[in-house]
Swiss-Prot record:
The active site is at D72, E131. This is N-acetyldiaminopimelate deacetylase. Gene3D superfamilies: 3.30.70.360, Zn peptidases. Its EC number is 3.5.1.47. It holds the Pfam family Peptidase_M20. Transmembrane segments: none annotated. Signal peptide: none annotated. Belongs to the peptidase M20A family. N-acetyldiaminopimelate deacetylase subfamily.
């Protein structure tokens, strides 16, 4: 695809953002685009139990392995405020995380290999439900990557607004944190504000729970390590002169290794049990990690990726640190070795998930060519 084709396609995708597992228009446009490519080497597959997902296999001429490339396809419940002439047509939904860029780069890579048969097999995975619903985990758990669709190594990108357009960046080890949703219900006894001895105040219990949770990172995580536990929602009480008999908390836990996350999850449960004993109340702690594991890059494959990027005179590569945001590609990289990397899209005054996020389309061609170059290099490596 030429740059003009990529831009046109990106703008079409940008106008039809859809939420997790609802990506019907997006799926249809992707399928139409892929069916318009040369079909000699392609096999297209849909998943009946995950109907907005799409897999495309490119048959290699002398395959020693199968390399996977993944892109996410869903959008966010955000009202777009970019002012672009090709802004979202769907009220209250926008590609505020740049998945339209991700899809366009993937289609550009696929179009190249549809015309230039690769040495190894390639499988492109157009994944629904990254922002929620664990789309990668859903596909893996239903056996999408078994048999003839087995993948030996997996790659994928995420756009990054604070890097110049076309810049590539990644690192050994963890790139994205793993995330866990925290839901806590505290159940005591309501009563008159003037008679606290006859009630069991869950606002006080909830405040104590939150305060104790804040000691977990400070005192259970080493000073050179990183983790975050944040509560962003608390509901309790109905009126000023009635003691709240119930409280509900919602928060998030984020860490850079699964071992650390498992430990912190247990500490949250332990504190919940302690609060229940201290305040003579019920504390129900629900932790949901789903498929949002840390994105941990494979050392061997990532070293190779970084070296290829650094050796490519057409690529600007920069080092990076891990980030506390989450990405469900972590689940797939927990099962299949691979590498995730950043693609700069030059929107430093905005950020991912912002209503005014507007990635620079100048990143499209460099993104496609850098990945094509890497994959062609990778296919020359012996298994």
């Amino acid at each position: 695809m030429k740059e003009a084709d990529l831009i046109t396609l990106r703008r079409q995708l940008h106008q039809i953002p859809e939420l997790a597992l609802q990506e019907k228009e997006t799926h249809a446009l992707l399928l139409k685009t892929i069916q318009g490519l040369p079909q000699t080497y392609l096999t297209i597959r849909t998943l009946p139990d995950l109907p907005t997902a799409l897999l495309v296999k490119v048959q290699g001429r002398d395959p020693q392995r199968t390399i996977g490339y993944r892109t996410d396809i869903d959008a966010l419940p955000v009202t777009e405020k970019t002012g672009l002439p090709f802004a979202s047509k769907h009220s209250g939904i926008a590609h505020a995380c740049g998945h339209d860029i991700h899809m366009t780069v993937a289609l550009g890579i696929l179009s190249y290999f549809a015309e230039h048969q690769p040495k190894d097999n390639l499988i492109f995975f157009f994944q629904p439900a990254e922002e929620s619903k664990n789309g990668g985990k859903l596909a893996y758990d239903m056996g999408a990557f078994t048999g003839d669709w087995h993948i030996d190594e997996f790659y994928g990108l995420h756009d990054r607004p604070d890097l110049p357009a076309g810049t590539i960046s990644t690192r050994l080890g963890t790139l994205f944190a793993g995330t866990t949703e925290i839901n806590v219900d505290l159940i005591g006894k309501s009563g008159h504000a003037a008679l606290p001895q006859n009630a069991n105040d869950m606002i006080v219990a909830a405040a104590s729970f939150i305060s104790q949770i804040q000691t977990v990172v400070a005192r259970n995580v080493g000073p050179t390590d990183s983790a975050v536990i944040t509560f962003g929602l608390m509901r309790a009480g109905t009126i000023r002169n009635v003691i709240a008999g119930r409280a509900h908390l919602e928060g998030t836990l984020r860490g850079f290794t699964q071992q650390q996350i498992d430990f912190l999850q247990q500490r949250i449960r332990d504190i919940g049990q302690g609060i229940a004993a201290s305040f003579n109340c019920q504390v129900k702690v629900a932790l949901n990690q789903g498929g949002y594991y840390p994105v941990e890059n494979n050392d061997k494959l990532t070293k190779d990726f970084i070296q290829v990027m650094k050796d490519d005179p057409d690529v600007t590569f920069v080092d990076t640190k891990p980030v506390m945001t989450g990405e469900d590609f972590g689940y797939l990289l927990n099962k299949i070795p691979g590498t995730m990397f950043w693609l700069g899209v030059n929107d430093p005054d905005s950020q991912l998930h912002a209503a005014d996020f507007s990635p620079d389309e100048a990143a499209l061609v460099p993104g496609v060519t850098a990945v094509v170059h890497f994959l062609e290099h990778r296919m020359l490596e012996k298994v």
